[in-house]
Each structure stands twice: as C-alpha cells, then as structure tokens.
C-alpha cells in the first residue's frame, strides 16, 4: 500500500447543509404530498413541499454495463440513493420506475450516489464522499453489482439521474487454452486501488492505497478458462508501462508490460494471448495473497483486509473463518497478517498436502490456489507475501508442490526472494527434495561456498548462515528482498523445494517470501548406449497388482531400459492385503514374459528361486542363465533369496549380470524366535550376509570357470551398508559389522560401486528412509563405460507408506530404482 499523511477516508464524515429551494419550477408550500405528485421520468425537476423527485436510471455508457452487467440487475439491487450527503431509500412508482424524493438545494446542485444491497462497506459513512476500490477483486461480476455509482443533476437530463461509474474498467480478453488462477496489474508509484475521497475532480487518495489490482480467478477451484473476458475496476489514471502478471492453475506465468489509460466511467478493452514465460516451469508470486499489511513497506505502509480487527496466529481471532472470497475493504496496519496459520497442527499436517490438511477454511485454501503445497506450516498471508513463523517462537515450514511440469531429468534454476524477520536468530535451510542435486548456489548474485551445499538421502541442502543475511533491526522501516538462486541437476517431476529455519528449538525463525520460480535449463542427460534398470519392487509390485501392473508397465516404458533386474519378483499376497494368495492366484514370476513384452522386452529369465523373493531379469537382448544359486556347500545355510549369473548377448558382446537379494534380518538365518534377540545382539544377521556374499563372489566373479569373462555387473538388494558411506554413517567404530557384507566385495573383487563413485561426497539413499542398501556394481571394463547413473526419484517411485489398507507396505515400493547407461 502506498502511504500518504492524510486522514483515513472511511473514518471521515462531512456535514452537508441542505436547503429548501432550487432552480426550476418553484412551487413551495402547495401542500401536495410528494408521493402523489403527477410527474414522469425525464421532465424538468420541480419542488413539492421542499422536495425534488429524481428518477434513478443507469447510464447506457456506464463502464460496468459495457463490462456485461445488466442495467436491470443493478436497478433491482438498488437500495438507497445519497443526494448531497443525505440518504434516501429507493421507492418504485406504479410503472416500476425507481425514484427518491430529495430535499431541494438552494444552489440547485445535486450530487448523487447509488448504493446497493450490502453496499455500505464500500463507502463507510457516505458514498458521496468515500469510496473503497479493492486491490483484491474476483473474476465474477459480484463487485460490479456492489460498488456505488454516481450522477450529477443537469438540466439536460431533468429529473432523471443517470448513474455512472467513478472508476474505470480494464477488460482483458485473454486468449489461449489455459485455466487462469490470477490476473495482476501493477504500476509502481501509482494509486490503482484503495480508499479514496470522492471529489468533483475524481478520486483523491488516502493513506491506504495500493499500486496493484489482482483479479482472483480461482472460482471455487474450477478456475476461469482463457478465452474469457477478465474485468478489473481501477481508479482512473494513466498506467502506461504497467506490469501484467497472469498465473494459471498449474503455476505457469506470463509477465508482460501493458499500457493502460482508464478514465472515470471508462471501459478499456485489450486482447492478450496467454503464452507462458519461456522455460518457466513453476512460479508463485503469491499474487492471490492480497490481505493484510504491507509488511515490507514499514510502519508508514498499510494494507486492506475483510476486517480491521487484528489477526492472531491461532484462536478465536485467527481469521480461520475467513472464506478467502471476502472483499478486503478495511484498512489495517503494515504488520497485521491477513489470515491465521494455514497449518498449525503438525500431527495433522505431516505427510499430507495443504489441500488435505489445513486450519484455515477449505474455501480460503482453494481461493489462494494453495492446495498442492506440501507444507504451509505456521504460514500466513500478508499483502503479496507469505509469512512463516510470524508472531510465534515455534518453527514454521514452507514446502512447494512437486514440480510436475518437469519431464525426465532436467537441470533447473530455483530462485527464491525472501527476507528474514527483524531479530531472526536462526539459519535458513533450503532443501531440494525428492529429485535433484544442487550444483551451485548464490545469494544476491554472490556465489556461496561449496561447503554450504550437501546431499543426504533424498535431499539437496543449502544453509544460509546469519552472517550472510541482512537481519532487519525492525520491520517498521522498509526492507529489501534477498535473492537466492539454486542450480539443480537431475530434477524430476517429484522434486519440490522445502525451506525453514534449521533449528526446532524456541527462537525467532520468522521470514517472509515474495516469490518462488523454477526455470528449465535443459536436459540433464539423455539415454546413451545400454540402459540397465534395477529395482526392488516389493512383493511382486503388490501396489499395482490389482491394476494388472498397468502403471508399472507405463513407468518402465517411460525410461526405455534395455535390461531390467527386479528383486522381490514374485507375487505373494492377495490384492491390497497381507493375506497370502493361493499358488494358483500368484501371477508372478510365471507372468514375467507377458509383462516384459508389454514394455518391449522379448527375453526374460528367473534367478535362483527358493522362496518368495527371487530376482527376474528381462531384456531386449538374448539372455543365457549360466548359474542359479539357492543352496551353499553348508547344510542349512542357503543363499536366502537366491542368486544367479545371467549372461546378456549385446550385439555379440557378452555381459554377465549377477543378481542377488541378501538376508534381510538383524538376526541370523534360521534362528528360532526365542533366540532372535540374542542373535541380533551378536550381529548374526550381518555375519550371515557376509557368509552369503562370500559364497556368491566365490562362485561368480571370482570363480575359475569364469576367469576369462571380463564384463560383469552385480546388482540387487544387499541389505547392508558400505564403507563408501562411512563419512555419513560413522559406524566403523560403533557398528563395524554393518559393513561386513560390502567389505567382501571391497576386499576380494575389483567391482566398483557405481552410484557411490559417481556421486562422491553425496549420500544417496536407495530406500524411503536414510539407507543405501541397493547397489549396482561394475567391473573395471564396464565402469569405464558408465555414461549416466542415477537413483531414480519421480512421482511414481516416491515411497509412500500404505495408510489405506494397513498393510505396512509402501506404494509402489520401499526401495528406489537405480538406472545406469553404458556406452559400449
């Protein structure tokens, strides 16, 4: 809101004097009841017992009529007319004409304003002198049926007052096929909306004005389709070079400049074809957040809300009952939020989107297009801004929706404009989650040190320490925005941005966010050479079993692998149940040839199958099974889930793939239940995995009969941790047996951990938690051919714990896939 040292208009009252004479045919004192006078619309005015009858009509050239509001609708909603400051209720004659009988004026001047039902909030004491033009408007024409209209008496029109608009209307015809969420027009230094004094010269500004108008087009979640006319009411003025920002339901944005010159009662129509800004994948400038104070403008700034009452974070005064569709017509101070905390109960919000869990009303959340946000915890709107942790010493969180517009693996730039609150005493943690690694970061154009960037599990993190931020001494003085830029590689359609103060203890964690923008910088990588895909698909892809594996098949096709290895490749349970299915109902593993053909693989083979968790390999190239492993040379000590050597013939090149799935428990194999705790304490699960791995290595990559074979891959669910990740785990001194299984490979083979070596210094979890237990190893000859390698995180593979069927399983799996391209 722009500031001026003037009185607030809505609190102002004018004392207007009335007289009993006027120009025209003077007939005072005749004793005729004004209601019985014999007069018709359009005649010269006449005075009967000190009153003048005026008929009320709508000017056919009124701006809102040109905008499509029917004059008959306006007249039917007419409630009262103010003439020279005095209110008169509207009456109707026998012909249905609306009229009032107003006190005659000695000077013969009559300034009138027409008020509509429920319209008093638009002008306070009198529409003749006050007018509120909201900065937040709606795509429906509701406001155009409520904002007062005005007329001045003239001899030319006689006793008819033709009501016009004091505002101008900009009508934008937005072409295209998008669904529009908001249209914002802004001109720095202007008074486009706010509270005004109505004078003969026009609308005079108060100390509560705005340099923008935002048209809310959310329409109850249906939005407004392009191809429509979008009308906004503006204070008359020249707004050449104004910025026009159009946002869609899926957070695409178009920004352009527009020359606008609207006159009082003027109607200016312009055509705009919606074309999203090049390469912008996702944007939120919080244009739909229009309520509350201008927190960045300082104490001399103001704002507007549906009520002038203070808003608290929680409780009865939190504004939680606000619907989001109310008109903001009351002035509020710069530091007053426009709503309560959008989310305030972590137990309710955790793991859900804002659309699923919120403390504000459903209508409010929809009206701000916030339903897709991952978190807006302890967040609330100010004017054009989202405030986090305001008015509380507890930490708040903002987390965007997933950037679903990303297709494949992309390099992106994420830009955040933010400002810490006065007295901020935390550090800010920005995390790119579920896809993508931060390659570089800058703050206000200055590069941040690499040691402030890390990757852990599924989260790429950047920390901003206090000494790098400008912490305001007080928000009562105007503030500037910081700009953080994050360059990210391998972002996917599941990627989202999470940020908050890092500490969870009591403190000043508050910050404000102006905008978030994600820009596409191009593909991270394309398929190159032989593409190998591995995944533990949890119980034979239990999650997609009732759907005949259609989603799974489409997902595989999207990556176009040449070879697939699936762990837990057998059906076990009935649909969405933990009840074991009869053997006759178990589609897998026998059904793999049929499934594989649906995603383009002609060949398939099953590994050592001794229980419910075998491995299956499928391929575009011929497969020869060289060895199946189930038992070992020690009785009662099998390779628990089997293993195999599957040989591919890739255009004449023979590649051996060892598939395996190691013992999963902390206790040893075959240990009776009563002894399992003791077995765990003795780390017998780790020792059994070590035993299995020694047997597999001795009979595959180190077996004399395969000494001439040079091209090897080994992959599967190893259920064990690697010394490559010791920098993160730090188990060497406290839990050294965790590394026994992987140490067999490290100490006895030349196999290379592809993911571990491709991303040094990064801890890349292969599960939904913080564990890297799935690996793809390569011989030196194969590792030298690695072109691309990634642990896939996308919208399909993000592990989500089953909350519907109480199975304890995940959708689609509790593991993440690994994808590697080899340039052979």
What does each of the following model-derived ranges do?
Residues 440-491:
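Extracellular carbohydrate recognition and processing domains
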Residues 522-598, 610-612, 814:
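N-terminal, active-site-proximal structural segment of metallo-dependent hydrolase catalytic domains
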Residues 569-667:
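Structured beta-strand-rich core segments of catalytic domains in phosphoester-bond hydrolases
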Residues 2-8, 22-280, 292, 298-300, ...:
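Sec-type signal peptide cleavage vicinity
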Residues 523-524, 702-713, 720-824:
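Metal-dependent phosphoester-hydrolase catalytic domains
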Residues 277-360:
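Extracellular carbohydrate-recognition regions
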Residues 393-395, 502-519:
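Extracellular carbohydrate recognition
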Residues 133-149, 325-406:
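Surface-exposed, low-complexity/disordered Ser/Thr/Gly/Pro/Asn-rich loops and linkers
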């Amino acid at each position: 809101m722009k500031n001026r040292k003037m009185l607030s208009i809505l609190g102002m009252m004018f004392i207007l004097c009335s007289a009993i004479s006027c120009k025209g045919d003077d007939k005072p004192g005749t004793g005729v009841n004004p209601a019985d006078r014999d007069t018709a619309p359009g005649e010269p005015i006449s005075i009967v017992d000190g009153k003048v009858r005026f008929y009320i009509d709508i000017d056919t050239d009124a701006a809102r009529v040109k905008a499509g509001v029917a004059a008959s609708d306006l007249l039917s909603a007419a409630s009262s007319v103010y003439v020279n400051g005095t209110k008169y209720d509207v009456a109707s004659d026998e012909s249905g004409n609306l009229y009032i009988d107003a006190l005659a004026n000695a000077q013969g001047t009559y300034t009138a304003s027409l008020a509509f039902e429920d319209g008093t909030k638009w002008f306070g004491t009198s529409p003749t002198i006050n007018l509120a033009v909201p900065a937040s408007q709606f795509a429906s024409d509701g406001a155009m049926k409520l904002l007062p209209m005005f007329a001045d008496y003239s001899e030319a029109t006689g006793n008819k007052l033709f009501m016009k608009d004091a505002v101008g209307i900009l009508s934008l015809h937005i072409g295209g096929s998008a669904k529009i969420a908001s249209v914002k027009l802004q001109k720095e230094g202007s008074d486009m909306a706010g509270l005004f004094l109505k004078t003969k010269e026009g609308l005079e500004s108060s100390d509560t004005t705005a340099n923008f108008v935002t048209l809310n087009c959310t329409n109850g979640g249906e939005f407004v389709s392009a191809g429509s006319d979008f009308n906004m009411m503006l204070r008359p003025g020249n707004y050449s070079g104004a910025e026009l920002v159009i946002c869609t339901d899926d957070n695409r944005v178009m920004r352009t400049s527009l020359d606008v010159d609207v006159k009082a009662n003027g109607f200016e129509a312009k055509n705009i074809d919606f074309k999203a800004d090049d390469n912008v994948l996702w944007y939120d400038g919080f244009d739909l957040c229009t309520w509350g104070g201008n927190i960045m403008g300082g104490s001399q700034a103001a704002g507007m809300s549906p009520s002038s009452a203070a808003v608290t974070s929680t409780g009865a005064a939190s504004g939680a009952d606000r619907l989001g569709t109310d008109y903001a017509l009351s002035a509020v101070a710069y530091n007053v939020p426009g709503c309560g905390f959008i989310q305030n109960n972590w137990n309710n919000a955790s793991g859900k989107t804002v659309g699923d869990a919120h403390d504000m009303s459903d209508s409010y959340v929809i009206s701000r297009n916030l339903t897709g946000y991952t978190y807006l915890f302890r967040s609330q709107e100010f004017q054009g801004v989202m405030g986090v942790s305001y008015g509380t010493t507890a930490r708040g969180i903002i987390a965007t929706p997933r950037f679903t517009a990303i297709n494949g693996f992309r390099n992106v730039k994420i830009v955040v404009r933010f400002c810490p609150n006065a007295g901020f005493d935390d550090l800010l943690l920005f995390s790119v989650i579920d896809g993508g690694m931060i390659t570089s970061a800058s703050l206000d154009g200055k590069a941040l040190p690499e040691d402030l960037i890390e990757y852990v599990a599924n989260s790429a993190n950047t920390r901003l320490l206090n000494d790098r931020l400008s912490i305001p001494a007080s928000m009562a003085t105007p503030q500037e925005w910081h700009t953080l830029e994050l360059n990210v590689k391998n972002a996917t359609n599941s990627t989202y941005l999470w940020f908050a103060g890092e500490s969870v203890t009591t403190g000043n964690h508050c910050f404000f966010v102006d905008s978030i923008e994600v820009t596409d910088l191009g593909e991270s990588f394309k398929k190159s050479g032989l593409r190998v895909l591995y995944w533990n698909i949890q119980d034979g892809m239990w999650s997609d079993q009732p759907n005949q594996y259609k989603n799974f098949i489409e997902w595989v096709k999207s990556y176009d692998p040449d070879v697939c290895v699936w762990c837990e490749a057998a059906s076990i349970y009935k649909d969405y149940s933990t009840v074991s299915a009869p053997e006759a109902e178990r589609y897998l593993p026998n059904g793999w040839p049929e499934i594989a053909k649906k995603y383009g693989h002609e060949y398939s083979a099953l590994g050592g199958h001794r229980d419910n968790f075998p491995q299956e390999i499928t391929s575009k190239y011929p497969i020869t099974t060289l060895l199946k492993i189930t038992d070992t040379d020690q009785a009662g000590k099998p390779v628990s889930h089997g293993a195999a050597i599957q040989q591919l013939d890739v255009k004449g090149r023979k590649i051996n793939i060892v598939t395996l799935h190691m013992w999963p428990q902390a206790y040893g194999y075959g240990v009776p239940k009563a002894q399992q705790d003791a077995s765990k304490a003795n780390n017998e699960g780790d020792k059994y995995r070590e035993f299995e791995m020694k047997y597999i290595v001795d009979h595959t990559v180190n077996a004399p009969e395969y000494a001439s074979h040079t091209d090897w891959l080994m992959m599967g669910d190893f259920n064990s941790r690697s010394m490559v990740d010791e920098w993160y785990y730090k188990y060497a001194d406290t839990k050294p047996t965790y590394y026994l299984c992987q140490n067999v490979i490290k100490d006895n083979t030349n196999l290379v951990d592809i993911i571990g070596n491709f991303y040094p210094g990064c801890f890349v979890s292969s599960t939904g938690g913080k564990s890297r237990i799935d690996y793809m190893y390569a011989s030196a000859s194969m590792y030298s051919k690695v072109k691309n390698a990634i642990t896939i995180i996308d919208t399909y593979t993000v592990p989500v714990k089953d909350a519907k069927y109480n199975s304890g399983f995940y959708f689609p799996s509790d593991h993440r896939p690994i994808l590697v391209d080899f340039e052979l």
